Amino acid sequence: MGTLSVNQNKLQKRLRRLAGEAITDYNMIEDGDKVMVCLSGGKDSYTMLDVLLHLQKVAPITFEIVAVNMDQKQPGFPEHVLPAYLKELGVEYHIVEKDTYSVVKELVPEGKTTCSLCSRLRRGTLYTFADEIGATKMALGHHRDDIVETFFLNMFFNGALKGMPPKLRADDGRNVVIRPLAYCSERDIQAYSDMKAFPIIPCNLCGSQENLQRQVVKDMLVEWERKHPGRTESIFRALQNVAPSQLADRNLFDFTSLKIDENATPRFLDVLNI
């Protein structure tokens, strides 16, 4: 790629800066880490790898990067694309072959959403492989919009206020998942992917499914953002600014013990002169 335009340079710097801030804020990568970068062939994971490779060069710490792709044996999957791309970059990589496609097609009725089962099978396989290669961190390409969408999905359909944290220790206790693009918008990532002309691999398994719950939420947020620019960022900031005493979760705040403080200074209000 030739010389970047002013706007392209700003975009690249913004993504690198935001990823660096997220990594620092959540202590995602530490000196000596071996980071397994999960590469799906989509715009998000390509951008994540690109940004991490840059940060690896300029960071004050030393860490390894190993790219890993999972070949789920989907029909028409272009097996040559990622190896060719990663060889050209000179990045260490592994292709993990696991026929989860057949499992998903067998267990999920025709017309039903495959995303949930597919994701669980893929995640379990990657956790195991991360352990095998001694990876200390597993990097996923989820961005700010993914995190906000997940928050609303859980609220609307699961009755829970939870999202997709920038850093997570897996239930097995042996894997730490990080999301370096947590502060980055999907719009910026899409623009960067277009600019870099990454060799995108579409998902034949779920990409053609319509009316997914996530797509409904995504469309809602896009419409909100169109009418009120900055709303998605505001919602994301809210996830970083939780006030348990202003919600209703008894496990997070002790409401049962609340009572007046006899030693508190009385507040007098002259209601007649308001």
From Swiss-Prot:
Keywords: 4Fe-4S, ATP-binding, Cytoplasm, Iron, Iron-sulfur, Magnesium, Metal-binding, Nucleotide-binding, RNA-binding, Transferase, tRNA processing, tRNA-binding. Pfam families: ATP_bind_3. InterPro entries: Rossmann-like_a/b/a_fold, TilS/TtcA_N, tRNA_Cyd_32_2_STrfase, tRNA_thiolation_TtcA_Ctu1. HAMAP family: TtcA. GO terms for molecular function: 4 iron, 4 sulfur cluster binding; ATP binding; magnesium ion binding; sulfurtransferase activity; tRNA binding. It catalyses: cytidine(32) in tRNA + S-sulfanyl-L-cysteinyl-[cysteine desulfurase] + AH2 + ATP = 2-thiocytidine(32) in tRNA + L-cysteinyl-[cysteine desulfurase] + A + AMP + diphosphate + H(+). PANTHER family: AMINOTRAN_5 DOMAIN-CONTAINING PROTEIN, SULFURTRANSFERASE-RELATED. This is tRNA-cytidine(32) 2-sulfurtransferase. One of its GO terms (biological process) is tRNA thio-modification. Binds 1 [4Fe-4S] cluster per subunit. The cluster is chelated by three Cys residues, the fourth Fe has a free coordination site that may bind a sulfur atom transferred from the persulfide of IscS. [4Fe-4S] cluster binds at C115, C118, C206. A motif (PP-loop motif) lies at residues 40-45. The thiolation reaction likely consists of two steps: a first activation step by ATP to form an adenylated intermediate of the target base of tRNA, and a second nucleophilic substitution step of the sulfur (S) atom supplied by the hydrosulfide attached to the Fe-S cluster. Pathway: tRNA modification. Its EC number is 2.8.1.-. SUPFAM superfamilies: Adenine nucleotide alpha hydrolases-like. It comes from the Bacteria. It is found in: Cytoplasm. Its main location: cytoplasm. Catalyzes the ATP-dependent 2-thiolation of cytidine in position 32 of tRNA, to form 2-thiocytidine (s(2)C32). The sulfur atoms are provided by the cysteine/cysteine desulfurase (IscS) system. Belongs to the TtcA family. CDD domains: TtcA-like. The lineage of its organism: Bacteria, Pseudomonadati, Pseudomonadota, Gammaproteobacteria, Pseudomonadales. One of its GO terms (cellular component) is cytoplasm. Its cofactor is Mg(2+); [4Fe-4S] cluster. Homodimer.
